[in-house]
């Protein structure tokens, strides 16, 4: 049963996580989203408050 000998499985797990953290994570985080949710102007966004009849 392989779960009784954690030596090779732990090494595989450790190497795969180090590969992910050291190589793949900076490549993934270097991508930026172009869709910034900042409004163009705050003056046009004024809306009257809603009427909540059930409150």
UniProtKB/Swiss-Prot annotation:
Assembly mode: F-type ATPases have 2 components, CF(1) - the catalytic core - and CF(0) - the membrane proton channel.
Record keywords, A-Z: ATP synthesis, CF(0), Hydrogen ion transport, Ion transport, Membrane, Mitochondrion, Transmembrane, Transmembrane helix, Transport
Membrane-topology descriptor: Single-pass membrane protein
Pfam short name (any one): ATP-synt_8
Protein name: ATP synthase protein 8
The UniProt record lists the keyword Coiled coil: no
Function comment: Mitochondrial membrane ATP synthase (F(1)F(0) ATP synthase or Complex V) produces ATP from ADP in the presence of a proton gradient across the membrane which is generated by electron transport complexes of the respiratory chain. F-type ATPases consist of two structural domains, F(1) - containing the extramembraneous catalytic core and F(0) - containing the membrane proton channel, linked together by a central stalk and a peripheral stalk. During catalysis, ATP synthesis in the catalytic domain of F(1) is coupled via a rotary mechanism of the central stalk subunits to proton translocation.
Compartments (UniProt record): Mitochondrion membrane
Species in which this protein is naturally found: Protopterus dolloi
Single biological process term from Gene Ontology: proton motive force-driven ATP synthesis
Major subcellular site: mitochondrion
Similarity remark: Belongs to the ATPase protein 8 family.
Transmembrane spans: 9-29
Listed InterPro entries: ATP8_metazoa (IPR001421), ATPase_protein_8 (IPR050635)
Record carries keyword Transmembrane: yes
GO CC aspect terms: mitochondrial membrane; proton-transporting ATP synthase complex
GO molecular function, one term: proton transmembrane transporter activity
